[in-house]
């Protein structure tokens, strides 16, 4: 080979191989890289990425540690938090145990969450997944229909989990799926109907195999299955399913059962008001869910039943002020970005909580109430340079006009973060 040809011969800048020794050589600004080096780099990056995202279930947190973490984000619901902590701990302990090839194989126990709207069902499931660092997906049962009808197939629930796991199937197979509004797929009548119930009993039947544990075929693009498309295979045996719903009306079923079983001179007399405080749901039996419209096989796939209490005024006030991401703290931060101090007095917090109770929205409705109160002032504050402090009182819920305090000197100054002092929520929030 001539010296001129040697100069023209291109080489990989990393391994030194010439373009004749590799399949492809890609040029950059003054450098070249061959296909072999690209493949090697890709393997190194993928290995490091897998190490970063691997679900570590060997150092499983204990139930007390799980509950302590839940306490930071979820106010009240002590019984529910304890039950969930134990259930989740046992679920992932079971996964570790079944890899040891013991004679006894532990079966999966999915969870059914019952509680009023805005009591914290979704938040509990989200917080659990965040703490355990596992993939998490939320699905809405009202969008699901039986295969072959307009709507979503049940396999689309698993697609959301796979997507949230960055298409890492092994990681997704140890995730958590929360199916909301599960009470909406109850069959329309307690008795089996001769007409097809495609969004009720049909969906329950379709969910059975996934809940129990099966290798499901998931269409990668979602939507309906087509015979000629490729599917993602995922084993649902180790996926924890948490199904939640308000189950409006099940309290009447429980009340009828307990009333008929507590007749006579020795019967315990309890007022309806006392039963409404959350004690009624704790008496729920599988037969009550059957009468509500869940089929026996579906009830059997959800052996752990956790009930949540209806939030009272005290609990709602704590939700407004105590969690790490409490609403009051969020709005204070928003105003602080405009160099304005925001203060909610105790009467205002009570009024907001009472309004949420009147609307029957629970904690979910708190943001809407505050947003409605603060809309006008949040519109005006950026333009009013003389306002240094905003105080929200009880009247503000109706008038939408909080008390405004002018800044010293007629112009507000940047707010400096306070150090060493903690404001008491009991005095002002």
From Swiss-Prot:
ATP binds at residues 116-123. Residues 1-53 form the ClpX-type ZB domain. It holds the Pfam family zf-C4_ClpX. Residues 413-423 have a biased composition (Basic residues). Residues 408-429 are annotated as: Disordered. GO terms for biological process: cell division; proteolysis involved in protein catabolic process. One of its GO terms (cellular component) is HslUV protease complex. Keywords: ATP-binding, Chaperone, Metal-binding, Nucleotide-binding, Zinc. SUPFAM superfamilies: Glucocorticoid receptor-like (DNA-binding domain), P-loop containing nucleoside triphosphate hydrolases. InterPro entries: AAA+_ATPase, ATP-dep_Clp_protease_ClpX, ATPase_AAA_core, Clp_ATPase_C, Clp_protease_ATP-bd_su_ClpX, ClpX_bact, P-loop_NTPase, Znf_CppX_C4. GO terms for molecular function: ATP binding; ATP hydrolysis activity; ATP-dependent protein folding chaperone; protein dimerization activity; unfolded protein binding; zinc ion binding. Belongs to the ClpX chaperone family. ATP-dependent specificity component of the Clp protease. It directs the protease to specific substrates. Can perform chaperone functions in the absence of ClpP. Component of the ClpX-ClpP complex. Forms a hexameric ring that, in the presence of ATP, binds to fourteen ClpP subunits assembled into a disk-like structure with a central cavity, resembling the structure of eukaryotic proteasomes. This is ATP-dependent Clp protease ATP-binding subunit ClpX. The gene is clpX.
